[in-house]
Curated annotation (Swiss-Prot):
Disulfide bonds join 30-38, 32-44, 37-51, 55-60, 104-153, 166-175, 253-285. The active site is at residue 148. Belongs to the glycosyl hydrolase 19 family. Chitinase class IV subfamily. GO terms for biological process: cell wall macromolecule catabolic process; chitin catabolic process; defense response; polysaccharide catabolic process. The gene is Cht4. Its EC number is 3.2.1.14. This is Chitinase 4. Coiled coil: none annotated. CDD domains: chitinase_GH19, ChtBD1. It comes from Oryza sativa subsp. japonica.
Length: 285
């Protein structure tokens, strides 16, 4: 009996060591910053899609104790940051949209309410630092939206149907026959490797039905916020220039398209002025 007990103790101890070694490895591979969850798909975020079922590391929901309590607070709208609704007023939103020509398809498509509906699914947006930082993040988001859509004029990328945005080497999110993954929505999400996981997170088949982004305004804003939270949000502390690099750096930064960079910066500075905050440093890329 003593021998069997010793064997069982050894097995339990060995299993504990194995599990303790596995957890840091998962966190290291995902690389999320503090306060963010690593989803089962390897993306960082703070909503249920990241911190719920399949969460690999970070303050996963159901992990208990302080982490779970903190996440519950964020779900309820507590914590740092400002009320997005109080900053993105009807006057601010329509002030952008009204600069687009009357014949623009986006003018009747994009609405403040659809943005607010989408923002409720991404509680980490503009909600994890100071009030001024939150306002700067909102200003940055809408600066890029303004530039990408021509003051919310465009829903679909100009001549996008003639472009090839299929990365055939990506086997996880394979392109579907007859489907096009050109830019759609507020941030003009493109490529199969973005449509696939965005749809998975939001709740539609992004690979088989990419046109959904141009048909449902709330889903359209959700894809923009999904992209933002996974690719841009984490660099906001580095200045607006870092957000340009995250969105379109390969085509605009390092002198490749100074006109586009200047346009984005000017929109950002204008929106910061409207929100009563300084734009901060490192504005260019």
């Amino acid at each position: 009996m003593a021998a069997k007990m010793a064997t069982m103790v050894a097995l339990v101890f060995g299993l504990a060591l194995l599990l303790s070694a596995a957890a840091p490895a998962a966190a290291q591979n995902c690389g999320c910053q503090d306060g963010y969850c690593c989803s089962q798909w390897g993306y960082c975020g703070t909503t249920e899609a990241y911190c719920g079922q399949g969460c690999q590391s970070g303050p996963c929901w159901g992990s208990g104790g302080e982490a779970a309590a903190g996440m519950a607070g964020r779900k309820a709208g507590a914590g740092a940051g400002v009320s997005v609704e109080s900053v993105v007023t009807e006057a601010f939103f329509n002030g952008i949209k009204n600069q687009a020509p009357n014949g623009c398809a986006g003018k009747s498509f994009y609405t403040r309410q659809s943005f607010l509906n989408a923002a409720r699914s991404y509680s980490g947006f503009a909600n994890d630092r100071t009030n001024d930082d939150s306002k700067r993040e909102i200003a940055a988001f809408f600066a890029h939206v303004t530039h990408e859509t021509g003051h919310m004029c465009y829903i679909n990328e100009i001549n996008g149907a003639n472009m090839d945005y299929c990365d055939k080497s990506n086997k996880q999110w394979p392109c579907q026959p007859g489907k096009k993954y050109y830019g759609r929505g507020p941030l003009q999400i493109s490529w199969n490797f973005n449509y696939g996981p965005a749809g998975k997170n939001i709740g539609f088949d992004g690979l088989r039905d990419p046109d959904k982004v141009a048909q449902d305004p709330t889903i359209s804003f959700k894809t923009a916020l999904w992209f933002w939270m996974n690719n841009v949000h984490q660099v906001m502390s580095q200045g607006f220039g870092a957000t340009i690099r995250a969105i379109n750096g390969a085509l605009e930064c390092n002198g490749k398209n100074p006109g586009a960079v200047n346009a984005r910066v000017n929109y950002y500075k204008d929106y910061c002025r409207q929100f009563g905050v300084s734009p901060g440093g490192n504005l260019y890329c």
